[in-house]
């Protein structure tokens, strides 16, 4: 049963991205989602014109579109978006570099897990925003402090998911490696990582999502650029249209990366490392 599920997932992953999106585009779910989105925009416009909220607190969709145009023409949208994307990329990259190896060690070694897992579980519940004051003291206001908050918030999902992947690996693979006296590096590279790959990718998805959420709060406090700063600056100027434009930009980038970049990475890594051999 598990092999059938694996084969189905590999078949889906092997499809070209455009083909998968073409199938989604004509699906019933897509049509329902589009209708719901249009209805939401119409309701939004109606509420904005009803007078329930003052104009300086509730922007109309047309005003948000105009905010997109004006901030783009001034270069503010591109500058702040690029600043946030840079911080997000560096923070997620560092979280992956630290989280994957530590997760492998925690999953593969009982002694290492007994020594360090309690500390990880103790620190993990601390919200990333709570680290901003210390990050400012350590790194000052700007790039480094924001990246630190993204890193510290995002390292845990990939770490715990990698550990779960290693601990749930079928014992027969470990037994075969031990019988043939496989070198430790070979065992990690050819057994642990491929076997844990679906968990690692899931952890990276969660890390990206968590980082993209926390970056807004971090930039509001510890940065003078970025989408979070742009949203907070618009608040002081009573510009809800710019605030919503920044929020939509964040949502669009997150959607594109989640549904295009990660799908592409998953397809390549599964074929190269993960389940291709199992499916055969």
Residue positions per predicted region:
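Transmembrane alpha-helices
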Residues: 148, 152, 184-218, 241, ...
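Short hydrophobic, aromatic-rich alpha-helical segments embedded in or entering the lipid bilayer
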Residues: 59-69, 73, 212, 222-235
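Periplasmic/extracellular loop-to-transmembrane helix junction in inner-membrane transport proteins
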Residues: 14-27, 49-94
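Transmembrane-helix boundary motif in ABC transporter permease subunits
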Residues: 90-120
